[in-house]
C-alpha cells in the first residue's frame, strides 16, 4: 500500500465521523463507533467472497442436525472466523426500516472469536444511540462506499483492469494505528499509550534479532509481547524473524489490558490466522 492509498483510506474513514456522528456523539466518543465499524467492515469484506457458500454449508449442517459446525464453517469461509447470518454490510442496506434489528442479527451471526472482539468494543451498547439518532443506515452506507477498498482483493473494472488495489493485512494495521493516533490527539491522550510507532518497532526487532542471525533453525518458535497494544510489535517481529529463516514457524502470543486495542489486535491476528 502506497502513502496515497493509505492517506485516502484514513481520511475517508475519519470523515465518516464528522459526516455521520456529529450532533449524536461528542468528538471524544467518535472512536467508540469508528474503530469497531472499521474492524467489522474489514472482516465483512474478507468474508464476502465465500458468504453464500458459508450459508449453504450452515443450512446443510442444520438439516443434518450437526451442532458442532465451527470447523466446517471455518474451512468453508477460508478463515478461522465466519458469519452465519443472511447479511453483509451491503445487504443490510436493502432493508432500511429494519436495519437496527438486522444489524443485531448480523452481529449475532459471527463466530465466537469475533463475538469476543464485539464484546470488547462494547458495540452492542451503542446500537440504541445509533437508532435514536437515525444514523445506523448512513453509517453503514458510508462504510460500503466505493471510494475506499477495505478488502484484501483488488477492485477491477468490467475489463479486468485494477482500479483500486487490495488492502494487505500490514496496510490495514497501518490504517488502524493512524486512526488510533488521530483519536488520541483529539482526546489529548499520550501518543504512545495504545501503540508504538513502526520506526521504534523496527529498531527494537533489529536489536533483538540481529544477534540471532544464523541461530534460528528450522522448527517452531513462540513470540510473546506482554503489553501488545494493537499487535504491531508482534507482526513486525514475525516479519523480521521469517526473513532470517523462512522455513521456521512462528506463533504469536500477547496480552493487553485495554479492551479496545485488544479487540483490534485480535481482529488482526484472526485475519492472519495466527
Short names for language-model regions:
Residues 194-274:
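Conserved S-adenosyl-L-methionine
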Residues 1-212:
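Non-catalytic, mostly N-terminal accessory regions of nucleic-acid modification and defense proteins
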Amino acid at each position: 500500500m502506497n502513502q496515497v492509498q493509505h492517506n485516502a483510506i484514513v481520511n475517508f474513514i475519519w470523515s465518516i465521523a464528522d459526516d455521520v456522528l456529529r450532533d449524536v456523539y461528542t468528538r471524544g466518543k467518535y472512536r467508540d463507533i469508528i474503530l469497531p465499524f472499521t474492524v467489522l467492515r474489514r472482516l465483512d469484506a474478507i468474508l464476502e467472497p465465500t458468504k453464500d457458500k458459508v450459508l449453504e454449508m450452515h443450512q446443510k449442517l442444520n438439516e443434518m442436525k450437526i451442532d458442532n459446525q465451527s470447523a466446517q464453517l471455518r474451512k468453508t469461509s477460508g478463515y478461522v472466523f465466519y458469519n452465519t447470518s443472511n447479511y453483509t454490510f451491503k445487504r443490510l442496506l436493502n432493508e432500511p426500516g429494519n436495519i437496527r434489528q438486522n444489524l443485531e442479527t448480523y452481529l449475532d451471526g459471527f463466530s465466537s472469536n469475533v463475538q469476543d472482539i464485539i464484546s470488547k468494543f462494547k458495540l452492542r451498547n451503542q446500537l440504541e444511540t445509533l437508532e435514536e439518532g437515525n444514523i445506523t443506515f448512513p453509517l453503514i452506507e458510508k462504510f460500503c462506499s466505493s471510494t475506499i477498498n477495505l478488502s484484501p482483493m483488488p477492485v477491477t473494472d468490467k475489463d479486468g483492469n485494477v482500479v483500486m488495489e487490495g488492502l494487505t493485512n500490514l496496510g490495514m494495521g497501518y490504517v488502524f494505528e493512524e486512526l488510533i493516533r488521530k483519536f488520541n490527539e483529539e482526546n489529548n491522550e499520550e501518543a504512545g499509550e495504545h501503540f508504538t510507532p513502526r520506526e521504534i518497532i523496527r529498531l527494537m526487532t533489529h536489536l533483538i534479532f540481529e544477534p540471532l542471525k544464523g541461530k534460528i533453525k528450522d522448527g517452531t518458535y513462540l513470540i510473546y509481547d506482554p503489553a501488545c497494544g494493537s499487535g504491531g510489535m508482534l507482526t513486525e517481529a514475525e516479519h523480521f524473524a521469517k526473513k532470517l529463516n523462512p522455513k521456521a514457524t512462528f506463533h504469536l502470543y500477547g496480552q493487553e489490558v485495554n479492551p479496545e486495542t485488544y479487540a483490534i489486535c485480535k481482529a488482526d491476528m484472526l485475519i492472519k490466522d495466527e
